Amino acid sequence: MYLQKFNLSGRTAVVTGGGRAIGLACSEALSEAGAQVYIADVDMAVAEEGRDALKQKGYAAEIAQMDVTDPDQVTAVAAEIAAARGGIEILVCNAGIARSETPAEEVADEHWLNVIDVNLNGVFWCCRAFGRHMLQAERGAIVNIGSMSGFIVNKPQEQSYYNASKAGVHHLTKSLAAEWASRGVRVNAVAPTYINTPLTAFAKANRALYDVWMESTPMGRMGEVDEIASAVLFLASDAASLMTGSVVSVDGGYTCW
């Protein structure tokens, strides 16, 4: 009974930025649970790389080129996938960028706009476009990738624009959850700690920075992509059928202090 709640057979799942790192792990987790996964990425080479990685493990993912900052393209891709599959049951908004170590007074206009456009606007465009199809079917689960940076101010690096974008994702998640709960669509988020991905590779080259990160984390380590994908799988599945508007911290205890 309980394991069956994680079975996603017959469902269509779209993962933005699903070809690498956390996104690829989410694509694999959802595929393993039985979903038909679409990897949506602005870079088709990355999407193809992810598709090939899944194929080597026995999963047949589809790919779609999609720039999350282009609302018209997002709407078109959502319509194409919904038409091809007869609906969309799961959306994972994972696409994002990170910029840090810039004092707020020195942040360039284009850097602020770029981070907000990808990390926050992109999540809204995707939730709106794919959510429309879920609302029509009165069924769906959306999982947004937020960050512990949406709860706390990271140290010692300065990253006001990234923090603001992720705080926005958290509150957008709650707002959409409240609006759509009675219409069959659940919206939740996962808030990861520092995860071993190319986005955090710079920290290991800076021992002083890395040591501060680890000293600030009760578990004393960075996370792995599969640890985030496991939380995403749970929230996307019927095992989380009573959960909506939740932002689940997967941070090794970082936000405890």
Region locations from a protein language model:
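Substrate-binding pocket helix/loop in short-chain dehydrogenase/reductase
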Residues: 102-104, 108-116, 213
